[in-house]
Amino acid sequence: MLRQLRLTMDILGWIFLPWRRSISNIKDSPPPPPLASTFDDVIVDYEDPDYLPLPEYPVRPNEPLETRKQRLLYQSRKRGMLENDLLLSTFAAKHLQNFSAEQTAQYDQLINGVSNDWDIYYWATDVKPTPKEYDTEIMRLLKKHVKNAEGVTRLRQPDLNT
């Protein structure tokens, strides 16, 4: 048994020998430069170039209001980024069923007229100013929802009503 223990210690010595050498080299070397912390709060957001072809969102003038609300509920849940999935799905679950036809059209324009979901997120959280064409009653309601004055926990999307 003592022989096995000694053999194990010899093997471990060979395994950790390069590691020990690197530790001794680290002690003799100067410390690494500090990480640059000046860019922690900078949002890198470039303007879209003019030549970038963006498809036009199809206008659906004859879509019934209930069908439109169902489509918007689905689209609010499936944004492709978790932040907007949570914000818009909880917002739609809370407010969409009470929207008038005009408010529903404003919400449709907001979530489908913008080409970049990060813009919606930054506007709703007041990180960036909202452009005039999207600064509507619905956007103000969304900003109020995002501030979460009620203190509601929003860790997942709300259940769908069946």
From Swiss-Prot:
Annotated localization: Mitochondrion matrix
Main location, first listed in the record: mitochondrion
Family from the record: Belongs to the SDHAF2 family.
Subunit composition and interactions: Interacts with the flavoprotein subunit within the SDH catalytic dimer.
Keywords recorded for this protein, A-Z: Chaperone, Mitochondrion
Lineage: Eukaryota, Metazoa, Ecdysozoa, Arthropoda, Hexapoda
Database matches in InterPro entries: SDH (IPR005631), SDH_sf (IPR036714), SDHAF2 (IPR028882)
Role of this protein: Plays an essential role in the assembly of succinate dehydrogenase (SDH), an enzyme complex (also referred to as respiratory complex II) that is a component of both the tricarboxylic acid (TCA) cycle and the mitochondrial electron transport chain, and which couples the oxidation of succinate to fumarate with the reduction of ubiquinone (coenzyme Q) to ubiquinol. Required for flavinylation (covalent attachment of FAD) of the flavoprotein subunit of the SDH catalytic dimer.
Cellular component, GO annotation: mitochondrial matrix; mitochondrion
Protein's name according to its UniProt entry: Succinate dehydrogenase assembly factor 2-A, mitochondrial
Keyword RNA-binding: no
Entry-linked SUPFAM superfamilies: YgfY-like
Biological process annotations from GO: mitochondrial electron transport, succinate to ubiquinone; mitochondrial respiratory chain complex II assembly; protein-FAD linkage; tricarboxylic acid cycle
